[in-house]
Amino acid sequence: MATSNQLTPGMTLSINNKLYRVESSVKVTVPKGTPFIKAKLKDLSNNEMVEKSFKLNQPIKDVSLIERRLEFLYPEGDEYLFLDVVNLDQVLVPAEIVSGKVNYLKEGVEIKAFFYGETIFAVELPQFLELMVAKTHSDDENDLANGAKIAILETGAKIEVPPFIETGDIIKVDTKTDEYIQRV
């Protein structure tokens, strides 16, 4: 059991049976008031950011998540099948854990998966992936005012790309911001 004074980025907490990852924390001192710790936390069940205040030296339950590297194989019904790259176990990941990241999954993509015991709580894609452009819209009605156009990637993701990108090009994409980085 740790205390609120020991909060550091990357630490995982259990609060009301929910897991949170500490993104940042700062000690706040107010005139004629009691100082406290203000933390930005990421809810691992839905990836939403929340702010929480803790009293100084307040006991907190820190937990250890196990990080495993998984390679995407294929979707299977409402779940996604991955292969643990270390022990070669197959792991079924529920759709709600993968939601929001599905459009970047293709066979062979390696992700980080975070487990608490045997339960998977979160997955994290690599920040950058190289994907093939399956289709681009080049007609004037689909062009955006900023000169970009919409491209549909091999995984089904839709992103804005510069006008010179064509079907069949391989591009580097930022999976966190859904942005085009460069042609490969």
Curated annotation (Swiss-Prot):
Q: In which pathway does it act?
A: Protein biosynthesis; polypeptide chain elongation
The UniProt keyword set, sorted, is: Cytoplasm, Elongation factor, Protein biosynthesis
- What are the subcellular locations of this protein? Cytoplasm
Q: What is its main location?
A: cytoplasm
One GO BP annotation of this record: peptide biosynthetic process
What Gene3D superfamilies does the database record attribute to this sequence? Answer: 2.30.30.30, Nucleic acid-binding proteins
Task: Identify the GO cellular component terms for this protein.
Answer: cytoplasm
HAMAP family per record: EF_P
Entry's family note:
Belongs to the elongation factor P family.
Task performed by this protein: Involved in peptide bond synthesis. Stimulates efficient translation and peptide-bond synthesis on native or reconstituted 70S ribosomes in vitro. Probably functions indirectly by altering the affinity of the ribosome for aminoacyl-tRNA, thus increasing their reactivity as acceptors for peptidyl transferase.
- Name assigned to this protein: Elongation factor P 1
Per the record, the gene is efp1
